[in-house]
Amino acid sequence: GEANRGLGYMFQMMNGARIDVGLGAACISSAAYYASLEYAKERPQGRKLTSKDPLSPQIPIIEHADIRRMLLFQKAVVEGSLALLFQCGIYEDLEHVTEGEEHENYNLLLELLTPVAKTYPSEMGILSCSQGLQILGGYGFCEEFPLEQLYRDVRIHPIHEGTTGIQGMDLLGRKMMMKKGKAAQLYLVEVRKAIKEAEADAELKPFADKLTVAVAQLEKVTLHQFDVAAKQGPEMFLADATLYLEFFGIIAIAWQWLRQATAAKKALQKNPGEADTNFYQGKLAAFRYFFGYELPKIEGLSHRLLNGDGLTVTMKNEYFED
């Protein structure tokens, strides 16, 4: 390479490594999901709340709504994360086979999504593995089952190749403003393509409308953050960059779930066999879970990001003492 270009070359390498970290976290989370799913199918405990017969046989814990909620959380996180990582892989492939402006556009999309693809699977992978361990109960801590190992293994991923805090500052402080905001605009075009396609399906349109609102919130929050940067300086601007990354990540995964739901609906119209039908219905269930349970979390994050009071900037070290 050229002299005095080492730092730039290193960051090119780091971008690929960061996506690999996200993929590693998603793989660990996937293993945890399947391990807890298998256990939930086999472990009998309790009875249906509607059952009045104390002598009736106990049911597998997967029959309990709270267990299904935890499994749906795992499925939504794992498969949403993998979809985003695959999307990054597509952009990387297209970057290699295109030239000129088209090549630059795919490069910008990949650059923008790299901190998200690294962080969302890593941070949410910890929570996903935690839910898997919770499903196993006390057995989750025992070496006879894989969850305790997976839970420990996934914890490193928000740390190495750039901590979550660094990724947040990279996204908000650099990637969103890259090429005068061109990367962000290209990304919004991609999301709106998915929204437009989903709107053609009457059952998916309400979900497409929810993502439209989320995208508008993303634009509002981002413009507000840029205003903070101009008027209050870099410390205030980047104080909650990690929260901005979380906010952005939830919307990005919602985008991927809307695309998966659109594909699943089209596949079901072809009347597939029982196994494929269950697969696509499972996709739609996880999609509904994400839009019903995870996407609403952006409301609180949006409020926080629009109403920053600088507490973390002005807090004195002495105030942390007992």
Positions of the model-derived regions?
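A glycine-rich, basic-preceded beta-loop-alpha segment at the flavin cofactor/substrate interface
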Residues: 1-17, 37-62, 221-232
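Glycine- and acidic
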Residues: 7-22, 56, 62-76, 103-115, ...
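C-terminal amphipathic alpha-helical interaction region
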Residues: 178, 194-322
